[in-house]
Amino acid sequence: MRRKRIDAIVSQIQYNTLADIGCDHAFIPIFAIQSGRVKNAIAIDISNGPLLNAEKNIFKKGLANEIKTRLGSGLKPLLDGEAQCVTIAGMGCETIIEILEDLDKFSSILQLIISPQTKLDLFRQFISTTDFYIEEELTIEEGKKKYTIFSCKKIV
């Protein structure tokens, strides 16, 4: 994931605790901590390889106290109360929707920042069936590609 897209995602974070699902190299939690947007983060990935890369980057930046890593699928490794904001970027829409099907188990999650690679209309349709609404929709360009970032807030 390139820096411009990461910066755009991080700039949308409005809460102190973050869970980054499909963290890959943990760039989102690292930049979120470094920028002061969040105080603590959990980087979650389903695969060992990306999680090891994430851990290396976290340790290299000296952020092991602020960012914890967990191996697992989607929101399953997360406990309610651990994160107010969840980021999911760089996955297809169907995968994101599958992950978010567990969303109702988490009363503490107040914001979603989602950047699907495919089927933006399907995501818009899905989010309208949840307790969240799209607060802001950004489109950024990196190289020849356009990326859409949805900042969604919980209806309270």
List each model region and its residues.
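Conserved SAM-binding loop of SAM-dependent methyltransferases across substrates and taxa
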Residues: 25-37
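Conserved class I S-adenosyl-L-methionine
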Residues: 15-24
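Short SAM/SAH-binding signature in class I
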Residues: 83-90
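Class I S-adenosyl-L-methionine
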Residues: 2-5, 76-77, 82, 94-156
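Conserved SAM-binding motif I beta-strand of class I
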Residues: 40-45
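S-adenosyl-L-methionine
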Residues: 1-16, 30-31, 48, 52-80
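Short helix-capping segments at alpha-helix termini
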Residues: 35-37, 59-64, 105-107
